[in-house]
Amino acid sequence: MSPKELAEAVNKRRTFAIISHPDAGKTTITEQLLLFGGVVREAGTVKARKTGNFAKSDWMEIEKKRGISVTSSVMQFDFQGKRINILDTPGHEDFSEDTYRTLMAVDSAVMVIDSAKGIEPQTKKLFQICKMRGIPIFTFMNKFDRDAREPLDLLNEVEDVLGIETYPINWPIGSGHQFKGIYDRFNHRVALTHPADENNPYLPLDEDGNVEGDNPLAGDGEWQDAMDGMELVEVAGNELDQEKIAKGDQTPVFFGSALTNFGVQTFLETYLQFAPAPSDHKTEDGDVVKPLDPEFSGFVFKIQANMNPRHRDRIAFVRICSGEFDRGMDVTLSRTKKPMRLSNVTEFMADTRENVETAVAGDIIGLYDTGNFQIGDSIYNGKKDIQFEKLPQFTPELFVRVSAKNVMKQKSFHKGINQLVQEGAVQLYRSYSTGDYILGAVGQLQFEVFKFRMQNEYNSEVVMEPMGTKTARWIDPDQLDEKMSSSRNILVKDIHDQPLFLFENQFAENWFKQKYPDVKLTAKL
């Protein structure tokens, strides 16, 4: 591919993550976007368990049974000349680490807000990560087909709580049973929820923002409220500023209903006008890798086992940061400096796959992994070593001892635990004194998902013995003396054979520091 062809291909890419608090409608809007991309003919409804019509992005068995997203899904489609890569992330706070890593692999984010509830805790946490990265954030105020808060209240809350300017692209006309449509100030039209002609749901606006010709909503109370709200925004609201949007200092706001697919097309079309093409990525030594650099590079931000349970396979998800990927190319794994050939590569629609012949910066590809990759690994095909910045890793707070319920299933148990730990949702430790397996996690749901998947995917029922909340602190191996261990500070080692203590509480940690003042303890490696 020539430099000109590479530039054209890269500039067509739009890669974004969808973030929200659980149940705000994140997965539903993902489904509707796939409809516009022609990927699915009808959206799977998360709550409709009896029909078996599950969300396309919720592909894992436990997600289908519980109606929650506990793993990031990757989906790709073409729309209006652009190649769109969507990463649908877990909404549940126990799986924040997976979401945080995913946000390192995108160029922008879509924040979905339940319009009846406004800003919720998980939304705020994920927004801060986006803000820290300085990526553009687009806001979709969802569920206006139900009773919702006043639009101005929602905008003010976003500005006050999140500290970002808002610019409403459109404005809702009513909500709930009185949801009449959307006033689209950006595209100069009104979209009706119940138009007289279903093939033409739009009313054009003149230069002054008034409906041209007959207005079926004229005299309607919801219409007048919407006009009053729009007038206030026009006079006292923020000016549209594309530079601020690019820096993540202003968020375009869209109102609509993902469930009824109203306002989603307006969002997608407008998003493509503002969203950035693939961006630069920093390396650990301070260099910047640009998307149009001719040499291929990328990093592993996610590992997923058993996307096809029949084959017990494992996929390493790679964000391409620069250049072009061609099937069969040779690359170097930065961590080991070992060469490898990328022959078996795939792209995704959740759990559905297609082989990839070529891909460019901005794309997400999947590498079949036989144990070579770790989360955070960098790969490249140039002469210069590239190691991208480290991905965030959370220190676990909850711990359980785990063992196989059936001693005859040890082989399945060990295979399952080793593969699932590679995904990074739970951390694995071994006791120095007993050799027991110990799992660490941020939240209880991670243990439940691990237990379910061990039985469902590896036919290995496990027994978990809660150890409660602990404080994990790593120690330099040169300073370690196994006699330091006690019932209040259990000595274990992680999967890299690095020693650490699990302290019972803050008092136990303080007591240890007083007894061994020269020993340095760290919260993370």
From Swiss-Prot:
Transmembrane segments: none annotated. GO terms for biological process: regulation of translational termination. Keywords: Cytoplasm, GTP-binding, Nucleotide-binding, Protein biosynthesis. One of its GO terms (molecular function) is translation release factor activity, codon nonspecific. It is found in: Cytoplasm. The keyword Endoplasmic reticulum does not apply. Residues 11-279 form the tr-type G domain. InterPro entries: EF-G-like_DII, EFG_III/V, G_TR_CS, P-loop_NTPase, PrfC, RF3_C, RF3_dom_3_sf, RF3_GTP-bd. GTP binds at residues 20-27, 88-92, 142-145. GO terms for cellular component: cytosol. Belongs to the TRAFAC class translation factor GTPase superfamily. Classic translation factor GTPase family. PrfC subfamily. This is Peptide chain release factor 3. The lineage of its organism: Bacteria, Bacillati, Bacillota, Bacilli, Lactobacillales. The gene is prfC.
